[in-house]
Structures are given as structure tokens and as C-alpha cells.
Amino acid sequence: MVTLTIDGRTVSVPEGTTILEAAQTLRISIPTLCYLKDINEIGACRICMVEVEGYARLVPSCDSAVSEGMVVYTSSPRVREARRVNLRLLLSQHETKCTKCTRSGNCKLQQLTNDYNLLGDHYIDDLKNIPTDYSNPVVRIENRCVKCMRCIQVCEKIQGMGIWDLMGTGTRTTVGVAHTRTLGESDCTFCGQCITHCPVGGLQEHDDTGKVFDALANKDRITVVQVAPAVRAAWAEFYHLDPKFATADRMVTALKTMGFDYVFDTDFAADLTIMEEGSEFIERFTHRNKYHWPMFTSCCPGWVRFLKGQFPSYTENLSTAKSPQQMFGAVAKSYFAQKIGVDPKKLFVVSIMPCTAKKAECALPTMKDEQGNQDVDVVLTTREIVRMLRGEQINPAVLPETPFDSPLGTGTGAAVVFGATGGVMDAALRSAYYLITGKEPKPDAFSAVRGMDSWKEAVFTIPGAGNVRVAVVSGLGNTRKLMHAIDEGDVDYDFVEVMACPGGCAGGGGQPIHDGQELAAYRGDILWSIDKSAKVRFSHRNKDVQALYREFLKAPLGEKSHHLLHTDHNGWKMPNEK
């Protein structure tokens, strides 16, 4: 152990501990901007500088190890002035039009500027007018970037993609897309993890709120909105409400108040996905020689983009089932439109998702009808819908609860857990077991696939089918390791669930941003608790899904089901795909 003194208080910590970590054990707060524990500890921003007795210069606390007898001052006049100077230098190269930024009120630089009383303009605003590319789901705004390198490190260390890189030298240093490409020319998965780890507004999702406001104002359009499972676990965070109070039903009221004609639950489509994907797995499993193995889930568009861009030879291994989002859109513009007696073209379908990659998915050429109309017209992230609610002065804290509309608003516990890593696998196995044996397993029989472990594997025995070898992975860095293991023959699975974001959709790139915090596990626990208390916990027991098959689709994997609910993953190309 190493003993040192910080601001007059003595503490003993393990050798190798940084000054910042040592201070945290004493609950002494040292401000940071670029720091992300175990990911970005490079001292680039120089905001965490501290004074150490015997050192001529101030040192960055985030990457300076403690030493025996060290005496540290975290807020001396010298330290405070240095932080103010460094903040001013950052502001000199930063677009300070905070009222126009989506991160206003939730910006680390803005917070630090206020904390250090840097009021007024200290530099002439003569930043170059650098055009912003708004053609992709992920948008980078050059003049808001503070060169903290977080996006570079998260993309490389967590997601294993290396899309972002440092370019230029000296005052020309900036962050850009590696290999001098545009983002659209790269193999970016649009997972959005760079956005949720950016401390400022340098990265954001493509804002589509204007399109939705226009649709809501158009009396000739019927607006239909679906709410993804993971959204209900996170939207309350913006309002500092208890998740038990900020229920999905209260969100329904908020959306109805905003003006949506129909508010449905993506859980319905998740149950439908299980019926199709589960049936597809059984078909493949019982006719092994006809298919490529293992079978991969296909509901995460970030993962699908990753596979097609990095391991294209495995594209045939993907389930042909569309994601719940896209199944919902297809059913809404066929079955539901028919049910209410309107032309499908009158429907404007909006998805509220925890995901930025969903914005790219809905625009794929394979996700349109024969006339070229998108099944889903617009995708909003959790952050965007809350901005809209705030813009309409809607306060969920005073709203009553309203149930989802029928018939696309019913979901089971199995559907809710789609938003947590392991949830799709768990739900699929529950119904696959029933479809094979005619008997329902215990709802928690497949709990081995749950939890935040980055790579989980299990073997389950299903009577009449034998052993089913499964794996669950989240985070693209972990996914790359799994794919290499499969490719080299080190592992052998039948069914694999992959989610691009660590922790699954609960930690998606469209979720609320809490700087320095990872809340996927917390949100996932909320979803598992909803499943635990649900009256129905099996997708095949969703009565509205049963009615959909009885009245319209006829059967899983049937002709109409295949036409509406399945897709050809070879029907579109990644930028580098031949």
C-alpha cells in the first residue's frame, strides 16, 4: 500500500493507483473532461491538474500514479487558475452557441465553465465554418469537438471498430474518420456509442423531430407510434422520476397528448419476432444439412452492419426475420391499415428506439413495400422524443396512465426483455421449447443467458430435439472475439444472440447520456423485473399475435409471413462490401 496526503487528509491505496482514484476514495472531487475509467486515461484536457509538493509543474491526476509520502493539493489557487486557463483555451476553439446544441444542460464543458465562473466571451468567435454532414444517423459537428479522444478510444477499445482517428498536428489537430473517408464511406455500424460517451455536443444523432412534428400537424396523415422495450426503462431519467412511476402507460398518455393517433408497443412485434425467428430456428435445427451454422439473431441493425462489413461470409447465418421495429411497420401498413379501413399510404409510422442504427435500418431498400414506401417512416431516439415532449411542455409527472392501443399494443414479459442482453435468446428458447414439445418450460428455465457478462454460453436440453448450444454476446469488441473463435473452430454453437451495444439495447446509442456512468445493467434489471411480474411470459401466448396469425398471416414462416416479416440480408451492401 502507498500512503499519501490529499488536501490535508491521509489515505492509503494500492500501488499503481492514480491521484484521481485516490482522491475519489476520500470523496474529494477532481474535475475531468476527457477521462473515462479504463478507456481514456490520457490527460488530454488538462482539467484534472493538481499540485504536488516538490513538483515544479502541475500534473494530470487521471494518469499520474501515487507515490509514498506524496502531498497533493486539488484546489489550490495555482490549480484553480490553471483550470480556468485551460477551460478558456478549450472555449477558444469551441462553438459556444449552447442554446442551439442538443447537449445544452447536459454538457460537461458547459458545467465546468459555470463551475469556474467563466462568464462572458473571452475570445473572438472566428472559428472556420466547417460544413456538417447530416446524411448519416451519427452526426459529427467539428466546431463542437474538444479533442478529448473519447470517441476514438470507445470505438477502438469497446467496439473494436476504429472508425474515428486523430488527424493533423498542432493547432490543426482534429478528429475525423480514419483513412480519410467520410462516415458514409466507412464501415461504421452507427451503434452510437461514440455519441453517448462524448462529453459535449460534438457527436449527436441525426435529428428527425421536425419530420414528426410536421406529420402530427398534417390532418391528412394518421400517425402511428411504437415504443421499444428499452425506452420504458430509460425515459424517466430525463425527468428524475422513479421508473416504477414513469411507466410505459404514462408514456402512452404523453404521446397521446402530443397528438399521436395510435400508440402501440414494440413488445407486440417482439413477440411476433419470436414466433418467426423461433420457428425458423426449429426449421434449421431439424434440417441441419440445408443451412449454415450457427444461426445468428438479426434484430440489432448495428450487429447486422458489423457482420456484413467485417465477416460478410457469414451473412447467410443471419436469421431472415426482420427486427421487431420493421415487423411492426410491415404489419401496421398492411394488417392494421386493413383493419381500420384506410389506405396504407395515409399511415405515418414512427419508432421510438434506444438506438441510432435503427435510423439506417428503416431506410434500407429491403425495408420497403412494392411501391417503395418505407415500412417505418421515421425513427426517433429516446433523447429525441424527450426533447419533443419538453418542447410541447408535457410533464409526465402529472399525467395519468393510459394503456397501449389495440390490436398492436399487447406484449408479454418475453418481449420486454428484448431490451436487455440475453433477452432475445431467453424469449426465443421459451417458445422454441413449447413449439417442439407442446409443453411450456418454467419461464426462468433459460436464465443462464442473462446478466452482463460480455460473452455467455450455455447448453440446454429440449426433449425431442436434444442439446442446443447457445451463446450471447454484447458489444462489438466482444463480438469480434466471438466471430474469430467461430471462424477458427474454437467454439461450436447452434444459436447466437448478438447486440452491438454493451448490455444490449438498454445501453443503446440513443439512450439518455449520463457522463461517466454506464447504466445498461440498471436499465436491464428494470426490464427483467417487468418480465418477472408479467401475467404472460411466453410470446406464443400473446392473444393479439395469435389473432394476427388467425386472421391475416395464417402461420409462422407461411407465404404472407415470409413476404412481410422476413428479409434478404444480401439485398443491400455495406460501403466496402463487394
Please give the residue ranges for each predicted region.
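Short strand-turn-strand beta-turns centered on an Asx-Gly dipeptide
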Residues: 6-9, 53-54
